[in-house]
Design a protein with these regions (language model features):
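Structured beta-strand-rich core segments of catalytic domains in phosphoester-bond hydrolases
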Residues: 1-33
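Second-shell loop/turn segments in exported
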Residues: 1-2, 34-42, 65, 124-130
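Solvent-exposed loop/turn segments at secondary-structure junctions
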Residues: 4, 21, 32-37, 69-74, ...
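Soluble non-cytosolic domains of exported or imported proteins
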Residues: 5-8, 38-46, 76, 131-135
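Extracytoplasmic/secreted envelope proteins and their assembly/folding machinery
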Residues: 11, 45-48, 52, 82, ...
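Generic enzyme active-site microenvironment
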Residues: 29, 65-66
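A long, amphipathic alpha-helix that forms part
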Residues: 38-60
Length: 183
């Protein structure tokens, strides 16, 4: 499922087997269009629409989607891609859920500092983003079936972690001073 013919970015799919339950599940890696602005947000919507339609057609419905979504907020008017991923629709088989239920106004909000993944630096070099840790661009979403209590394959509470982030670097570089997550 890697090729998206509409000129958008590819999505990588792995089909895996959960050894304990025998459940076959799909894992997807994404890197959606970067940068702010309506044209970039519209491309993210196009990319997530293709993904959601693909997930709606899965059977059975066990999946994990992770990667750099580059989504700046959950505001449907400025970032309709987030709604495409997480909102209820006529077909909810492909609806995605945040297993830690930390959806809200994460941009530049210290209450979300433990899940921020961008930007790990405050100065610009090599073409990358700067500004310090103040956005949640990297996510792991799961299908409803993985969250169900009676499911043969379940999310294990407390295992979601923004790797390298100790929650103490809001608007700072991730390596500014001590970092209790990696040291």
């Amino acid at each position: 499922y890697t090729a998206q013919s509409s000129g958008t970015r590819d999505v990588i799919e792995w089909v895996m087997l959960h050894n304990l339950s025998g459940v076959e599940f799909n894992v997807y890696g994404v890197h959606l269009k970067a940068s702010s602005g309506s044209s970039n947000a519209n491309q993210r919507l196009q990319e997530t629409t293709i993904l959601r339609n693909h997930l709606n057609n899965l059977a059975p419905n066990f999946f994990i989607v992770g990667g750099d979504f580059n989504i700046y907020s959950n505001n449907s008017s400025s970032e309709p891609a987030f709604d495409m991923l997480t909102s209820s629709s006529d077909d909810n088989d492909g609806q995605m859920f945040d297993p830690i239920n930390r959806i809200g106004h994460w941009h530049n909000n210290s209450s979300y500092s433990d899940v921020h993944t961008q930007s790990p630096r405050t100065s610009s070099f090599g073409g990358g983003a700067n500004g310090g840790m103040d956005d949640r661009f990297d996510w792991l979403f799961v299908s409803q079936s993985i969250l169900d209590q009676d499911s043969p394959m379940q999310y294990v509470e407390g295992t979601y972690w923004a790797v390298g982030n100790d929650g103490n670097h809001f608007n700072d570089a991730i390596n500014d001073g001590n970092n209790n997550s990696v040291s």
